[in-house]
C-alpha cells in the first residue's frame, strides 16, 4: 500500500527534473544566455553524447538471464497492436498520416521508466516490480527507440507514398543562355534503405544500447566487472543525461511563443494516448499471454508512466512534432502521480 513516504519519494525523483527544465527555460527567456544556434547545438550534444552514454550505463547493469520473457512478450504484443491500429488508420482514414502515426506511437508506447517508474513501482509492488520496470526500460532502449530512429531516418530520407515520381528543375545553361529542364527521379527503395542503414550505423543511440546489452551478457555470464576507468568515463557524461535532456526541453519551450505550444486539443489527445490507449493495449497483450497477479498490474502501470524524455529529443532533432512531445512530457509528469494512483486502486480488484 502507498503511504505518504512513498509519495514523497516519487516527488523527490520528479522535482529535480523540473528544476533543470526551469533553468533551461530561464536561460533563454529571462537571461538571454543562449542564441537559437547555440540551442540547436545543445540539443545535438544531448542527442549524440549524453543520452547514448546514459543508455550504455543502465543497459550494462541489467541481468539478461533473469528477465521475465513472458512480460517482455506481452510488451511486444501490445506494441504490435498499436502499430497495426496506427497503420490501418494512416492507410484507410482520410485524416490518417504517416508522420502522425510516428508521433502517436511515441505517445502510446514510450515511457519514462527509470526516473518515475522505479520509485513508484517499488512503493506499489516492491522489488519485483522494480526489476520488471527496469527490464521494460532496457527493452525499450534496445528495440523501440531504435525502431523509432529507423522510421525517423526513413522519413527524413524522403521516401513516402506522398513523394511525386518526378521533379522538374529549371536550370540555365551559362554558355547558351537558354533555360533547360532537368528531370530528377525519386530515389529507389534500395537507395533510401541504404542511406537509412548508413545513418543508423553511425548514430551512437543505436550502437550504445547494443554495446550495453552485450556487456550485460558477458559480465553476467562470466561474472566480470567493468574496469573502473571505463566505468568512470561513461558515468562522467551519463549522469548528466536526464538533466541535460530536461534543460534542453526548457530551452525549446522558451523559443516558442506559447507555453502550451501544441494547443489544448493536441495536449488532450496526447494525454489520452499516453494514459488510456497505451495501458489498454498493454492490458490486452498481458491477458492474452496469461499474465496475472502483480505482474499483470505492473505491466499495466508501467505502460501508463509519463512520456519518455528521449522521444522529445529525437523529435526535436528530426523536426517532427517536438511541440506535442514536449507538452506530453511536461504535463504528463504533472498528472501522472494521481493517474497512476488511480490505476493502482482500480487494479486491486483484478486477481
Curated annotation (Swiss-Prot):
The keyword Transport applies. GO terms for cellular component: cell periphery; endoplasmic reticulum; endoplasmic reticulum membrane; plasma membrane. It holds the Pfam family Mem_trans. It is a multi-pass membrane protein. GO terms for molecular function: auxin efflux transmembrane transporter activity; auxin transmembrane transporter activity; identical protein binding; protein homodimerization activity. Auxin transporter regulating intracellular auxin homeostasis and metabolism. Mediates the auxin transport from the cytosol into the lumen of the endoplasmic reticulum. May also act as an auxin efflux carrier when located to the cell membrane. PIN5 and PIN8 may have an antagonistic/compensatory activity. Involved in unfolded protein response (UPR) activation. Involved in the control of vein patterning. Promotes vein formation. PIN5, PIN6, and PIN8 control vein network geometry, but they are expressed in mutually exclusive domains of leaf vascular cells. This is Auxin efflux carrier component 5. It comes from Arabidopsis thaliana.
Amino acid at each position: 500500500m502507498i503511504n505518504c513516504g512513498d509519495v514523497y519519494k516519487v516527488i523527490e525523483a520528479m522535482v529535480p527534473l523540473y528544476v533543470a527544465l526551469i533553468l533551461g527555460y530561464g536561460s533563454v527567456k529571462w537571461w538571454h544566455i543562449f542564441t537559437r544556434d547555440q540551442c540547436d547545438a545543445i540539443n545535438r550534444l544531448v542527442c549524440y553524447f549524453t543520452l547514448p552514454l546514459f543508455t550504455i550505463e543502465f543497459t550494462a547493469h541489467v541481468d539478461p538471464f533473469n528477465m521475465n520473457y513472458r512480460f517482455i512478450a506481452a510488451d511486444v504484443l501490445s506494441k504490435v497492436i498499436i502499430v497495426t491500429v496506427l497503420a490501418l488508420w494512416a492507410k484507410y482514414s482520410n485524416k490518417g498520416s504517416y508522420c502522425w502515426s510516428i508521433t502517436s506511437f511515441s505517445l502510446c508506447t514510450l515511457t519514462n521508466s527509470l526516473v518515475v517508474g522505479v520509485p513508484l513501482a517499488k512503493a506499489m509492488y516492491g522489488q519485483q516490480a522494480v526489476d520488471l520496470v527496469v527490464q521494460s526500460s532496457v527493452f525499450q532502449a534496445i528495440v523501440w527507440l531504435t525502431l523509432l530512429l529507423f522510421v525517423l531516418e526513413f522519413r527524413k530520407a524522403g521516401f513516402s507514398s506522398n513523394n511525386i515520381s518526378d521533379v522538374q528543375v529549371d536550370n540555365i545553361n551559362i554558355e547558351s543562355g537558354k533555360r533547360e529542364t532537368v528531370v530528377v527521379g525519386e530515389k529507389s527503395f534500395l537507395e533510401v534503405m541504404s542511406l537509412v542503414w548508413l545513418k543508423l550505423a553511425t548514430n551512437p543511440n543505436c550502437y550504445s544500447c547494443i554495446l550495453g546489452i552485450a556487456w550485460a551478457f558477458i559480465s553476467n555470464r562470466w561474472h566480470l566487472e567493468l574496469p573502473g576507468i571505463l566505468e568512470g568515463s561513461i558515468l562522467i557524461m551519463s549522469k548528466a543525461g536526464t538533466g541535460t535532456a530536461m534543460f534542453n526541453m526548457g530551452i525549446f519551450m522558451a523559443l516558442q511563443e506559447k507555453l502550451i505550444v501544441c494547443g489544448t486539443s493536441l495536449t488532450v489527445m496526447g494525454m489520452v494516448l499516453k494514459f488510456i490507449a497505451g495501458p489498454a493495449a498493454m492490458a490486452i497483450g498481458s491477458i492474452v499471454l496469461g499474465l496475472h497477479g502483480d505482474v499483470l498490474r505492473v505491466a499495466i502501470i508501467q505502460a501508463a508512466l509519463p512520456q519518455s524524455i528521449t522521444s522529445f529529443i529525437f523529435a526535436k532533432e528530426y523536426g517532427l512534432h517536438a511541440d506535442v512531445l514536449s507538452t506530453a512530457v511536461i504535463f504528463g509528469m504533472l498528472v501522472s502521480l494521481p493517474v497512476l494512483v488511480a490505476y493502482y486502486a482500480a487494479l486491486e480488484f483484478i486477481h
